[in-house]
Regions:
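Long, low-complexity serine/threonine/glycine- and acidic-rich segments characteristic of extracellular
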Residues: 1-368
Length: 368
């Protein structure tokens, strides 16, 4: 959350990756920034080296409440989906630099974090994870899996509850081969340039919503992301949930995979849109998200996804509330982890986690 306790011309906070935590798979890279002169761009630096610009302009009502007198504070978020597995195993640092429209800049506090990695560049086969022969144990907010099979390699995994994700994240990997995961592989397109919507052979207008994933179950804080290209340029990306406009998505994230499919479309290499989204803010049950891309000449491209939400009784489990598994029991089967009698914020639940390719991790898919 934001606090209005500074008079600096440019303000910036990097919220994920979380300082002193362990990250793996596909997660969020996010924060917020403000400038009295408006924010021009956000740079992300990894291990002291410039990595990329992050799309800016996401909805942040909390920042707006903390800084009501600064124009644009309610659209001050920056966010993108990021494959932490594109980094080597071990310790890393990240910082964000905000530049305002007058040329001033401000660095965020550097975040020190670690990366744990699985066994391949990218696990694209949803059945490559097999827990049939795994042994499980539970302790406080952790799930230990011994002898899990990942692409036929025996691996021991440790998962831990993370407040930022509102779910369990892999924080330790033992066994197998540790050389894995490049972001460009994760984002390889399942479409060809021939599938683009075209008014003429020289005109392209295309939008693809990648998460939430069609017909899947989502819970906790995840990504809402995709890409859009147009020969005449993209003006904005609107997000509709269950037919109602909710916000614009920050646009302009690096997508070399899209550029490879649309090399002749200007801006295709920076065609991603993404934001961190708390799916628990929605009611349990079925929902539809639609992304509407508006071109600079008034054209429109749409892409939608129908999905389901499962959730605890609260929309957000704060860090002061307890996730306690010490008296729970656990069984594993295929790609699923089933936990019985878990205590979450004082209430008792049965919870099912399932392996998800998009996240490269286990997501909560059932809560009873």
């Amino acid at each position: 959350a934001a606090t209005a306790a500074t008079s600096n011309m440019v303000r910036i906070t990097l919220q994920e990756p979380v300082d002193a935590e362990i990250h793996t798979g596909v997660g969020n890279l996010r924060g917020w920034a403000l400038g009295d002169a408006g924010i021009d761009k956000i740079e992300m630096w990894i291990d002291g080296v410039y990595a990329f610009d992050v799309p800016y302009g996401g909805a942040r009502s909390d920042v707006g409440r903390a800084f009501p007198d600064i124009t644009g504070s309610t659209e001050s978020g920056f966010s993108m989906a990021y494959s932490y597995s594109s980094l080597a195993s071990g310790d890393h640092s990240a910082k964000a630099i905000a530049y305002d429209n007058s040329g001033n800049s401000k660095e965020s506090v550097s975040t020190e974090f670690s990366v744990a990695k699985l066994t391949e560049d990218f696990i694209g086969d949803p059945n490559a994870i097999n827990l049939d022969e795994a042994n499980s144990s539970l302790d406080r907010d952790e799930i230990a899996l011994n002898d899990a099979s990942v692409s036929n390699e025996p691996v021991d995994l440790l998962l831990k509850w993370r407040t930022a994700e509102q779910g369990f994240e892999i924080i330790e990997v033992r066994g197998g081969d540790s050389q894995v995961a490049m972001l460009s592989v994760r984002q390889e397109l399942p479409v060809s340039s021939g599938s683009a919507i075209a008014a003429t052979s020289d005109t392209v207008v295309r939008a693809v919503l990648e998460e939430p994933v069609q017909n899947e179950i989502h819970s906790g804080v995840g990504n809402l992301r995709g890409w859009a290209v147009a020969s005449e340029g993209i003006e904005r990306i609107e997000i509709y949930i269950d037919g109602e406009y909710v916000f614009d998505a920050p646009y302009g994230g690096a997508r070399q995979d899209v550029a490879g499919v649309f090399p002749d479309v200007s801006g295709s290499a920076e065609s991603g849109f993404s934001l961190a989204f708390n799916y628990n803010n929605l009611a349990a049950g079925s929902h539809v998200v639609e992304a509407v891309a508006h071109t600079k000449q008034g054209g429109i491209a749409r892409s939608s996804s129908t999905f389901n939400v499962v959730k605890f009784s609260q929309d957000f489990i704060s860090s002061s509330q307890t996730v306690d598994l010490k008296d729970a029991s656990c069984v594993t089967d295929s790609t699923e982890i089933r936990i019985f009698n878990a205590v979450v914020a004082g209430d008792t639940y049965d919870v099912v986690l399932d392996w998800r390719v998009a996240e490269q991790g286990f997501e909560i898919v059932e809560i009873r």
